């Protein structure tokens, strides 16, 4: 038992990826690589591989709540990383719990769509994500399609990438790491 130990614990709250390239599995690897202790709360089960998503299975909200309570009641949480949240009800549940448990640092990756076009956030949940969850985060890490969706503006080159990062930071009063991997250029700059 790590009951409120001094070991830095980072909880990732997200969906799964059975191939380990994204989601909870990738977050656990990244957190472990920093020397922190990874914990997780699964929001949705995703059947996917490196090519496509075949199915998404929702998890009952009461079970997500039980996972949150189990982790936060036992570990000293130094940070929370939010990923695939899928629906508005999960976002509202998290907003209430983040206000209750008040973790010192929240990173939000506003996962919305796969590279193959499969929706990972229901469209009606975007407003809740932006209006209710952004204000609680210290850092957001959108990719280009996510930033375009949030800003309703295209990002075509490095200058528009930079401008989008600045606009997001100013508009939401938040730190931004805008991932440039979708930019059609020789390099893929992050800002």
Predicted regions: what they are:
Residues 52-59, 118-123, 152-156:
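Short glycine-enriched, charge-decorated loop/helix-capping segments at active-site entrances
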Residues 109-121, 125, 129:
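Rossmann-like NAD(P)(H) cofactor-binding subdomain of soluble oxidoreductases
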Residues 16, 82-83, 118, 179:
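Glycine- and other small-residue-rich loops at beta-strand/loop junctions that grip anionic moieties
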Residues 13-32:
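Glycine/serine-rich anion-binding loops at beta->alpha junctions
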Residues 2-12, 32-115:
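Conserved N-terminal subdomain of the carbohydrate kinase-like
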Residues 123-191:
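Conserved phosphate/ATP/ADP-binding segment of small-molecule kinases
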Residues 1-6, 23, 187-191:
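Acidic-glycine-rich active-site phosphate/pyrophosphate-binding loop
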